[in-house]
Every structure is written in structure tokens, then in C-alpha cells.
Amino acid sequence: MNLVSLKDIVFGYSHTPVLDKVSLDIESGEFVGITGPNGASKSTLIKVMLGMLKPWEGTVTISKRNTEGKRLTIGYVPQQISSFNAGFPSTVLELVQSGRYTKGKWFKRLNEEDHLEVEKALKMVEMWDLRHRKIGDLSGGQKQKICIARMLASNPDLLMLDEPTTAVDYDSRKGFYEFMHHLVKNHNRTVVMVTHEQNEVQQFLDKVIRLERGEKGGWKCLTWNSCDELF
């Protein structure tokens, strides 16, 4: 079952195309890595998939339902973590708890399941012991971790991650890859992740999408269904 399909996508800035006839399919239950050199428009590709950027040409299709027939939910962690506004949420715990709020139910009363999911997400990124710390007192790497935790707490079917581990240490990155692999293989999640840590993550990936320069100057997609084919 295809969750995401791109067909002949062309997109650019001003009058310069950066994605040139990009086509790809992402199936349910895959751990997909998007790679390529710096400036290869990997972040742009993710934003086109999410509908944050409208392509000049081509079509983007995202399934409205998961494999169980329920409404598909999507989690997104951007490359650049925006600065958090003062006020609510003011602590690590409050921010991650907000991942459990559904649309139209901000400040809902959290139940036992909600609290367990929040605790599990914070422990996964090794931030449980800092749950009462003010967000303004966190380092860049810690802010990146709690953004990941907030997404995990929402239990999305499709996880879209734009270099989510750039500011964290090697052991934390490895643990994160292992957990993503666990979600894919044991909980029927689908993960799409932009990464530069190819050597670290390759053993966990089901598919690799690499952006390479096309003849007209834009970036094209090459897809490998086995990491061994690329690496």
C-alpha cells in the first residue's frame, strides 16, 4: 500500500527549478532514508511531500487512511527547531504533553494512556529526568530531543523527519534509529528521514532515495530498494 506517491514533481525558487521531474513511492511499513549532498533540496522534497510547498508541475498523493482503515496521522520534525515562545508550554513535560492534544481539544484532560505515552516518549529520548526543566534553559540538542518526543507522543502513522539527530550525540542517534526501526517492524509505522549519517543508519533502512544533480541543473531522485545497492 502506497502512503506517499510523487509523480513528475517540478519545484523551484524564483525561476530556478531545484526539483526536476521527481517521482517516488513510499509504501506502508517502510523505513526510508533521503540522502544527497548539501544543498540537494532534501528539505524541500520533504516539504513538498507534506503539502507545505506547492509544486510547479506534477502530483503529490498521500493516502487518507492507514492500513487499518483509520484516518492517517502524520508527525513532522523540521530541520530547524523554531524558538519557543514564552508562556505555555513552559516546561519539557508540558510541551511533550501537547502532542497528545487532538485538533479542537487544546488543554484537554489527559488520561492514563496519555501520561504513559508521554513518559515513554521522554524516556526514549533520555529527557524524562529533565521533564520539569524550563524550555528556555535547554541546549539546542535537548530542544531537538523534546521535539522528537512530542512527535512520538502523538503516535503518528507516518513520521516525516528532516535531519532529526544533527544536534545529538552518537549514542543518542543510534538509539533513535533503533527505535524508529522498532516502530516500523513491530508497530506498522512508516518513517521517512532526511539524513547525512548514511553509515550509521544504513543497517536500519528498507529503501534509500538519493538526490543527484540532473542534466538541467535541478535535482532528480534515484531509488534503491536495498541499502547494499547504494552503500
Swiss-Prot record:
Induction: Repressed by zinc via the metallo-regulatory protein Zur. It catalyses: Zn(2+)(out) + ATP(in) + H2O(in) = Zn(2+)(in) + ADP(in) + phosphate(in) + H(+)(in). PROSITE patterns: ABC_TRANSPORTER_1, ABC_TRANSPORTER_2. Residues 4-230 form the ABC transporter domain. SMART domains: AAA (SM00382). It is a peripheral membrane protein. It holds the Pfam family ABC_tran. Keywords: ATP-binding, Cell membrane, Ion transport, Membrane, Nucleotide-binding, Translocase, Transport, Zinc, Zinc transport. Its main location: membrane. Part of the high-affinity ABC transporter complex ZnuABC involved in zinc import. Responsible for energy coupling to the transport system. ZnuABC-mediated zinc transport is required for comF expression and competence development. This is High-affinity zinc uptake system ATP-binding protein ZnuC. It comes from Bacillus subtilis (strain 168). The lineage of its organism: Bacteria, Bacillati, Bacillota, Bacilli, Bacillales. The gene is znuC.
